[in-house]
Each structure stands twice: as C-alpha cells, then as structure tokens.
Regions:
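A Zn2+-metalloprotease active-site environment signal
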Residues: 1-162
Length: 162
C-alpha cells in the first residue's frame, strides 16, 4: 500500500513523535488490508442486491462508488490505533506522540461532525483508548524520537496556499 504524507500533517504536528504516531496508525490500515476488507464487504452487499433484483450492473456501480469513497469502520480505526501503538513500542519509540496528536485533533473536532455520523470513533474516545493502552503496556525501553532537525524541516516546508 501507499501512504501519502501531506504538508498539513507536518505543519500540525508539534514533534516527530506525533508524525510517527499517525504513520504507525496508517501503516496498520495497510498491513491489516482494511481497504480491501471494506471493498469486499461492500461488494458482497452489492452482489446480494444485484442478484436479488437481477441487475449485475448494481454490483459494478457499488464497487465503483466504494473505490471512490473508501472509509474505515470504527472497528478498523480502533484496530489501527491499537496495533499502531504496539508497533511503535516494538520499535522502542515512545507512543505518547500518538496520544498528543489525538488530543490535538479532539480539540479541533469538538465543534465539527457529531460522533454518531462519523465512521471514525470520536477522537476523545480514541485518545482515552490510547491512554489506557499506554498504561496497560508500559515500555521502559521506549524513547522519544530525536527532534534536532524538526524545526529546520518545518521551516523548509512550502508556504501554505491562501
């Protein structure tokens, strides 16, 4: 799979640990094949509908729609959060950057989409899950990522579009 890092993430992150937390989460979506599982699930329902009404083009239409609007279920998001945190710990990287980034997102999300509409678990709940996992799986060997080049990298980012 491919993971694209946008400059917006680099601008919003306060330190490399936050970027590592986001990337660990996204890598888990790829490793767990969440996109494929979501497409197969949707295709299965589309095939059932198509066979029921006798219109196989419904299957093709549903697959095309799903490819354009992929999203992960709340369960898949929680799995990516949990496995991403464990991957950071296996790499001996402190996972608290993941927690800080979720807390930052929660501060921004409070006035946006109601939780019952979103496919993602509410950010505050995700932050609490990460906090609980960190407490349940201590990693004394884990260290923060070095940040000596962090500010220079952020300063080198292209200007934001107006």
């Amino acid at each position: 799979g491919i993971i694209v890092v946008h400059t917006g993430l680099l601008r919003q992150a306060s330190d490399p640990g936050e970027v590592a937390g986001v990337l660990a989460h996204e890598v888990q979506h790829v490793e767990q094949r969440h996109s494929l599982r979501q497409m197969i699930s949707s295709l299965g329902w589309g095939a059932l509908v198509g066979l029921t009404i006798g219109d196989i083009s419904a299957v093709a239409a549903m697959l095309a729609h799903q490819a354009g609007t992929l999203y992960f279920s709340r369960d898949m998001e929680q799995e990516a959060d949990r496995l991403g945190l464990l991957a950071l710990q296996r790499a001996q990287i402190r996972p608290d950057g993941m927690l800080r980034f979720f807390q930052k997102l929660d501060d921004e999300d409070k006035a946006k989409v109601p939780g019952w509409i979103s496919s993602h678990p509410q950010t505050a709940a995700r932050a609490q899950q990460i906090r609980s996992l960190i407490a349940a799986t201590p990693c004394p060997a884990c260290v923060p990522l070095a940040s000596q080049h962090w500010q220079a990298m952020k300063a080198a980012l292209p200007p934001t579009a107006k």
